Curated annotation (Swiss-Prot):
It is found in: Virion; Host endoplasmic reticulum lumen. Disulfide bonds join C82-C135, C165-C249, C191-C244, C196-C207. Coiled coil: none annotated. Keywords: Calcium, Capsid protein, Disulfide bond, Glycoprotein, Host endoplasmic reticulum, Host-virus interaction, Metal-binding, Outer capsid protein, Signal, T=13 icosahedral capsid protein, Virion. This is Outer capsid glycoprotein VP7. It comes from Rotavirus A (isolate RVA/Monkey/South Africa/SA11-H96/1958/G3P5B[2]). Some rotavirus strains are neuraminidase-sensitive and require sialic acid to attach to the cell surface. Some rotavirus strains are integrin-dependent. Some rotavirus strains depend on ganglioside for their entry into the host cell. Hsp70 also seems to be involved in the entry of some strains. In group A rotaviruses, VP7 defines the G serotype.
Length: 326
């Protein structure tokens, strides 16, 4: 009898010990699985994009309702506007207080006194050599001149777009343009650009690489030149480096905080023919030639419409920054 009781107790104890061992083993296995799973989740979470589900709040009202931007009407309170005009405008107006008058008129359109800056430039040529567009919004007035039509078009292409540029060493290297957005931009007091296309043996095509007089002249004594050649073909260049600097540039896209207003002229400047130029007619405008007072009155009257087709940008443009990143 006692032997049976001892056997029963011993069997019970062994069962308890075995159960405890099994439970501990299961606990260790579950801990391993859980911690390994959490570890994998932590490692992969930076590389995954998942929806973060929160409290399910009911949405009342129509989702199609148009809500006005609360800052849209306050644009002028925190922004600056630069108005660039030629010297002849100030000469014709001949009034020492004309800027104050215009500032008061801009105030009636929502631009506080001190937020509008009047920037004078001597002529298109000098402005193209050293463009300085520092304001949130920049409006450039260019009076049409048939003799400067090319410079005006290239200046518009320069300031209405952003460019990434690098220096060129034309004495050591041949250069080629990789695509239509790749241009060579030259600036200086007098830029004469000659090019000689090369074949795969680096021999001149229709020119002699050792004789610059046989090169094809693409620009003569200009202040600003945007040179476009056949893509994928090496070229040897001859540039008047004493009075001109040339850069290898890539057009990145539109500079949306700049607008150009052509004043007068029977021909309308249009740079949208370039396949790399997105339609920019909204930021390149024209008004009929009148007295300069009337021109400025027109700009003030339509400043709201002009600004609406522009976008505020923080990146400025000057001739130094232009060469590297605009």
């Amino acid at each position: 009898m006692y032997g049976i009781e001892y056997t029963t107790v011993l069997t019970f104890l062994i069962s308890i010990i075995l159960l405890n061992y099994i439970l501990k083993s299961l606990t260790r296995i579950m801990d391993f699985i859980i911690y390994r799973f959490l570890f994998i989740i932590v490692i992969l979470s930076p590389f995954l994009r998942a929806q973060n589900y929160g409290i399910n709040l009911p949405i009342t009202g129509s989702m199609d309702t148009a809500y006005a931007n609360s800052t849209q009407e306050e644009t002028f309170l925190t922004s600056t506007l630069c108005l660039y005009y030629p010297t002849e405008a100030a000469t014709e107006i001949n009034d020492n207080s004309w800027k104050d008058t215009l500032s008061q008129l801009f105030l009636t359109k929502g631009w506080p006194t001190g937020s509008v800056y009047f920037k004078e430039y001597t002529n298109i040529a000098s402005f193209s050599v050293d463009p300085q567009l520092y304001c949130d919004y920049n409006v450039v007035l260019m009076k049409y001149d048939a003799t400067l039509q090319l410079d005006m078009s290239e200046l518009a292409d320069l300031i209405l777009n952003e460019w990434l540029c690098n220096p060129m060493d034309i004495t050591l290297y041949y250069y080629q343009q990789t695509d239509e957005a790749n241009k060579w931009i030259s600036m200086g007091s007098s830029c004469t650009i000659k090019v000689c296309p090369l074949n795969t043996q680096t021999l001149g095509i229709g020119c002699l690489t050792t004789d610059a007089t046989t090169f094809e002249e693409v620009a003569t004594a200009e202040k600003l030149v945007i040179t476009d050649v056949v893509d994928g073909v090496n070229h040897k260049l001859d540039v008047t480096t004493a009075t001109c600097t040339i850069r290898n540039c890539k057009k990145l896209g539109p500079r949306e905080n700049v607008a150009v207003i052509q004043v007068g002229g029977s021909d309308i400047l249009d740079i949208t023919a370039d396949p790399t130029t997105a339609p920019q007619t909204e930021r390149m405008m024209r008004i009929n030639w009148k007295k300069w007072w009337q021109v400025f009155y027109t700009v003030v009257d339509y400043v709201d419409q002009i600004i609406q087709v522009m976008s505020k940008r923080s990146r400025s443009l000057n001739s130094a920054a232009f060469y590297y990143r605009v």
